[in-house]
């Protein structure tokens, strides 16, 4: 049976460096997918950037709804703008940072109903360059 999910029903996650709303996941009945709406604010002077994270068991597909940013990954740096999509393979450390003057809005998809298993995320930068 099809189901409708609204942004108002989304679970707010307390993740460092961004606002993240989990709209669809195993917690609300999904069997094999998680979808999040993520807003990365414009960095403030002196603010410590968040560190890279990884998802060991699954890919992450990120679609840019609005704004400008860069995804720093073990395989390289990828500039992003509205309409771009980046696919991160399982286990690759990565972080997306806002490089624009307005919030960076992303839609993130994972082929798993529970992405907490295998996700490792430190609080601050470790290993990738600061980008402001």
Over which residues does each language-model region extend?
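Conserved short histidine dyad/triad with adjacent acidic residue
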Residues: 36-56
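Short polar/acidic secondary-structure junctions
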Residues: 26-29, 85, 99
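A short, N-terminal "cap"/entry segment at the start of jelly-roll beta-barrel domains
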Residues: 1-35, 51, 117-132
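Short, charged/polar surface micro-motifs in flexible loops or helix N-caps
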Residues: 28-31, 40-46, 68, 112-116
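Ligand-binding loop in jelly-roll beta-barrel domains
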Residues: 70, 90-116
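A structure-centric signal for secondary-structure junctions around beta-strands
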Residues: 32-34, 58, 103-104
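A short beta-strand-loop-beta hairpin characteristic of the jelly-roll/cupin
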Residues: 47-49, 56-82, 89-92, 97
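Conserved hydrophobic/aromatic beta-strand scaffold that supports enzyme active sites
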Residues: 22, 35-39, 61, 77, ...
């Amino acid at each position: 049976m099809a189901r409708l999910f609204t942004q108002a029903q989304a679970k707010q996650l307390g993740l460092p460096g961004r606002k993240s709303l989990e709209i669809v996941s195993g917690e609300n009945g999904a069997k094999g997918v998680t979808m999040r709406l993520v807003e990365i604010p414009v960095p403030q002077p002196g603010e410590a950037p968040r560190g890279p994270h990884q998802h060991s068991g699954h890919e992450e597909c990120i679609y840019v709804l609005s704004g400008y940013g860069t995804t720093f990954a073990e395989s390289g740096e990828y500039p992003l703008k509205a309409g771009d999509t980046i696919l991160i393979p399982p286990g690759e450390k990565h972080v997306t940072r806002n490089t624009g003057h307005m919030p960076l809005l992303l839609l993130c998809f994972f082929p798993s109903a529970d992405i907490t298993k295998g996700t490792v995320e430190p609080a601050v930068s470790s290993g990738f360059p600061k980008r402001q």
